[in-house]
């Protein structure tokens, strides 16, 4: 068994959709990034890649490549899932935490879990998504950005 950890941070900006966990969430701002800036899927992707010692998402999907400009991060996560499988691993579980003040995402967590599970072809019961605020502290508390942390466990097939 192997453990991976992933962390991602993105800044809030105007005139962008807010996509988290593959789900569009109504909000006045979105996250800035080369792709769709899905902070949660990026953290999960990094955790999985790290568990298999395959580097990080920057190595596989560089932000200097026009191929990944505004790309749906679900496409990236599906590719990561294939890389993990090709290396001979299966995903045991994923646990993730979203850190942001607003908007509240509780109504979307089930859909996020289902989206992540579908991308990775695993049962929804293997995916945990939680959310918390930063108690108005720091850049997250000032609603300047959002962060996500993820850990995963993979095992050889």
Curated annotation (Swiss-Prot):
Record's cofactor remark: Binds 1 divalent metal cation per subunit.
Sites marked Transition state stabilizer: 34, 133
Biological process (GO), any one: terpenoid biosynthetic process
Keywords associated with the record: Isoprene biosynthesis, Lyase, Metal-binding
EC numbers for this chain: 4.6.1.12
CDD domains, per database record: MECDP_synthase
Enzyme's top EC category: lyase
Catalytic reaction(s) noted: 4-CDP-2-C-methyl-D-erythritol 2-phosphate = 2-C-methyl-D-erythritol 2,4-cyclic diphosphate + CMP
InterPro entries, per database record: MECDP_synthase, MECDP_synthase_CS, MECDP_synthase_sf
Biological pathway: Isoprenoid biosynthesis; isopentenyl diphosphate biosynthesis via DXP pathway; isopentenyl diphosphate from 1-deoxy-D-xylulose 5-phosphate: step 4/6
Residues annotated to bind 4-CDP-2-C-methyl-D-erythritol 2-phosphate: 8-10, 34-35, 56-58, 132-135, 142
Chain coiled-coil ranges: none
Cofactor(s) in the UniProt record: a divalent metal cation
Amino-acid positions noted as binding a divalent metal cation in the UniProt annotation, renumbered to this chain: 8, 10, 42
MF-aspect GO terms: 2-C-methyl-D-erythritol 2,4-cyclodiphosphate synthase activity; metal ion binding
Subunit structure: Homotrimer.
UniProt-listed NCBIfam families: ispF
Protein family according to the UniProt entry: Belongs to the IspF family.
Described purpose of this protein according to its UniProt entry: Involved in the biosynthesis of isopentenyl diphosphate (IPP) and dimethylallyl diphosphate (DMAPP), two major building blocks of isoprenoid compounds. Catalyzes the conversion of 4-diphosphocytidyl-2-C-methyl-D-erythritol 2-phosphate (CDP-ME2P) to 2-C-methyl-D-erythritol 2,4-cyclodiphosphate (ME-CPP) with a corresponding release of cytidine 5-monophosphate (CMP).
HAMAP family tied to this protein: IspF
Protein name listed in UniProt: 2-C-methyl-D-erythritol 2,4-cyclodiphosphate synthase
Origin species: Prosthecochloris aestuarii (strain DSM 271 / SK 413)
